[in-house]
Curated annotation (Swiss-Prot):
Entry-linked InterPro entries: Amidase (IPR000120), Amidase_CS (IPR020556), Amidase_dom (IPR023631), AS_sf (IPR036928), GatA (IPR004412)
Known EC number: 6.3.5.7
Annotated GO CC locations: glutamyl-tRNA(Gln) amidotransferase complex
Enzyme class: ligase
The reaction(s) this protein catalyses: L-glutamyl-tRNA(Gln) + L-glutamine + ATP + H2O = L-glutaminyl-tRNA(Gln) + L-glutamate + ADP + phosphate + H(+)
UniProt xrefs under Gene3D superfamilies: Amidase signature (AS) domain
Biological process annotations from GO: translation
Gene, per the UniProt record: gatA
Protein name in UniProt: Glutamyl-tRNA(Gln) amidotransferase subunit A
GO molecular function: ATP binding; glutaminyl-tRNA synthase (glutamine-hydrolyzing) activity
The organism's place on the tree of life at top rank: Bacteria
Its biological purpose: Allows the formation of correctly charged Gln-tRNA(Gln) through the transamidation of misacylated Glu-tRNA(Gln) in organisms which lack glutaminyl-tRNA synthetase. The reaction takes place in the presence of glutamine and ATP through an activated gamma-phospho-Glu-tRNA(Gln).
Keywords noted in UniProt: ATP-binding, Ligase, Nucleotide-binding, Protein biosynthesis
């Protein structure tokens, strides 16, 4: 059952918030041991469900929260041994807003350590399996949230997107994932990876559920100086006819895709034309180089952000006879991929190489953004694949560069700050395929309106993996 359908049933008195919480908790306990979507569950869930006011706008809805988003009183690990027992004394703004409207945190979902990865294989605890094929990855780094949705272990989820970490797992698991305009959702309480790129993003199994979630979490926040004063009107934007829109298909993303992705793109273009959109091919010339710039800028910011984990203030502290030895031993607890990115980031920020790498990457970022702004003077939306192929098998991307190439089509939205939405667009065999829409800065609602029209024309909502009995 979809989130807006659950909410309607609660409002009519057909089911109570407690009954909803009990049903999802039972399903998680039955199915998640074989899936690994959750790192921890909210032990007070049923108590909180019994106490919630059923008249609140989101009463009856439980939310799976990625485990790099702070939840007061509930363990928040960022998928790292370094924060294995960290219980935040504060709440992320996005979580606080959900709770104020009656939603409940079901549990914390698995991720690549500190959000650094594209498969959830880099979690310090265990990998998450793709509900459509247990031998394949769910994507990352928000793989636990995507898998929980696809298996119907939760009706709504929060992830975070630094270079595609909401959209890529959404594509691999056949769900919706939105990377909002940078600043549209407060980052307060999100454990930082790369602060100029990070963004909390909603995930769901229908566009209406995505709009419900965005209306709850978006909006300005005095605790985040980068948050935007843009009132959310997502559910309102879904009403009425689809306006005439100009759709640009990004030429640089048309080659090298798998047959299923190519077929999904062709079918989507046919649907959008039938919906009245004018379609043309456009060029975003710098997009193929965006990946190289991203893997300079993101590690550079990570090396600064992760310097705080020295064992002196919070997190796990390794033993050492002196402070320096203790700090070295503590940081040795970082996983291999985190160490790799911190080393890269430290190198590109070093005095001898700063301008050659970091300075040039920042200049490229400005050029990429200028090109995108020019494109949106010609079209209203951009369309490209979310990933070049469906989910890959575990262990298939052992070469770090091969794993980094998974972000080829997604990093552009992060570097430019633009909103981007991955939506289910078909299958390659038994594996879901996702496509991606981008809109101009601040026009997140436009993405959802176009995706809803596609969803209604193709019956893509309610897609879930065939696991267990349906709720």
């Amino acid at each position: 059952m979809l989130a807006h359908e659950i909410r309607a049933r609660v409002a009519r008195g057909e089911v109570s918030p407690l009954e909803v919480a009990q049903a999802y908790l039972k399903r998680v306990q039955e199915l998640d041991p074989g899936l690994g979507a959750f790192l921890s569950l909210n032990e007070r869930l049923l108590e909180e469900a019994e106490a919630v006011d059923p008249g609140l706008p989101l009463a009856g809805l439980v939310v799976a929260v990625k485990d790099n988003i702070a939840t007061r009183g509930l363990r928040t690990t960022a998928g790292s041994r370094l924060l294995e027992n960290f219980v935040p004394p504060y709440e992320a703004t996005a979580v606080a807003r959900l709770k104020a409207l009656g939603a409940l945190v079901l549990g914390k979902t698995n991720l690549d350590e500190f959000g650094m990865g594209s498969s959830t294989e880099h979690s310090a605890f265990f990998p998450t399996k793709n509900p459509f094929d247990p031998d394949r990855v769910p994507g990352g780094s928000s793989g636990g949230s995507a898998a929980a949705l696809a298996a119907d272990l939760a009706p709504l989820a929060l992830g975070s997107d630094t270079g595609g970490s909401v959209r890529q797992p959404a594509a691999f698991c056949g769900v919706y994932g939105l990377k909002p305009t940078y600043g549209r959702v407060s980052r307060f309480g999100l454990i930082a990876y790369a602060s100029s790129l990070d963004q909390i993003g909603p995930m769901a199994r229908s566009v209406r559920d995505l709009a419900l979630l965005m209306d709850a979490v978006a909006g300005p926040d005095p605790l985040d100086a980068t948050s935007l004063d843009l009132p959310p009107r997502f559910q309102e934007a879904l009403e009425g006819p689809l306006p005439p829109l100009r759709l640009g298909v990004v030429r640089e993303a048309l080659a090298g895709n798998s047959p299923g992705v190519e077929r999904a793109l062709e079918e989507a273009l046919k649907v959008f034309r039938e919906l009245g959109l004018s379609v043309r091919e456009v060029s975003w010339p710098s997009l193929p180089q965006a990946l190289a710039a991203y893997y300079i800028l993101a590690p550079a910011e990570a090396s600064s952000n992760l310097a705080r984990y020295d064992g002196t203030l919070y997190g796990r502290r390794a033993e050492g006879e002196e402070v320096e030895g203790m700090m070295e031993a503590t940081r040795a607890l970082f996983g291999l991929e985190v160490k790799r990115r911190v080393l890269v980031g430290t190198f590109v920020l070093s005095s001898g190489y700063y301008e050659a790498y970091y300075g040039r990457a920042q200049a490229f970022r400005r050029r990429l953004k200028a090109e995108a702004q020019a494109l949106f003077r010609e079209v209203d939306l951009l369309l490209l694949p979310t990933t070049p192929h469906p989910a890959f098998p575990f262990g298939a991307r052992r070469d770090p560069l091969a794993m980094y190439r998974e972000d080829l089509y997604t990093v552009g939205a992060n570097l430019t700050g633009l909103p981007a939405l991955s939506f289910p667009a078909g299958f390659e065999g038994h594996l879901p395929v996702g496509l991606q829409l981008l809109a101009p800065w601040g026009e997140d609602e436009r993405l959802l309106r176009a995706a809803l029209a596609f969803e209604e024309a193709t019956a893509r909502a309610h897609l879930k993996a065939p696991l267990g009995e349906a709720l």
